[in-house]
């Protein structure tokens, strides 16, 4: 993946917009472990709407966000509103949330961005919800129990700023001992 990134950026870490990279992954895919992987599509998510962000993460899993990284965040586990200068752009994955904010994966660690910082346009510049076959696998069901047709419809809703109705799947029913053996 790193080689492909450097091929795209001209051999150095010159950066790229997330949407440009997602377009390449949608059209060509990326090579990992000797296999090519593509995404079906993606939509931009309005990160200033907290409930929409939560829905995107719940339905589509980890979502890429573009950050204008302030220097204070390079040394802290909690990323909050700050007046420190921007050191550069950074692409991370938002992978969960709680009452305080969103959890992001970066530099091999998990950090928390407070809701005040996350929903601001000062530090975030882009957020996307991608849909990939790796998310729903060959059974066409996501880890959250949604079928691929619902995922495609919900992707369009999220992109339009609409929070889809999220009905949790029924819990699995265990087979009683002695039955089905």
Where are these regions (language model features)?
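Catalytic-core signature of thiol
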Residues: 1-180
């Amino acid at each position: 993946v790193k080689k492909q990134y450097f091929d795209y950026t001209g051999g150095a870490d010159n950066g790229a917009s997330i949407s440009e990279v997602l377009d390449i992954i949608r059209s060509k895919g990326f090579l990992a472990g000797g296999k090519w992987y593509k995404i079906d599509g993606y939509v931009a998510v309005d990160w200033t709407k907290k409930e929409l962000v939560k829905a995107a993460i719940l339905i589509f899993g980890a979502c890429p966000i573009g950050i204008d990284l302030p220097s204070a965040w390079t040394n802290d586990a909690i990323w909050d509103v700050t007046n420190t200068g921007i050191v550069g752009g950074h692409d991370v994955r938002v992978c969960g949330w709680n009452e305080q904010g969103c959890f992001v994966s970066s530099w091999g660690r998990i950090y928390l961005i407070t809701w005040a910082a996350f929903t601001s346009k000062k530090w975030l510049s882009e957020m996307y919800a991608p849909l990939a076959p790796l998310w729903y696998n060959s059974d066409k069901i996501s880890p959250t129990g949604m079928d691929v047709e619902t995922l495609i419809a919900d992707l369009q809703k999220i992109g339009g700023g609409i929070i889809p109705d999220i009905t949790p799947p029924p819990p699995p029913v265990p087979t009683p001992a002695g039955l089905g053996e």
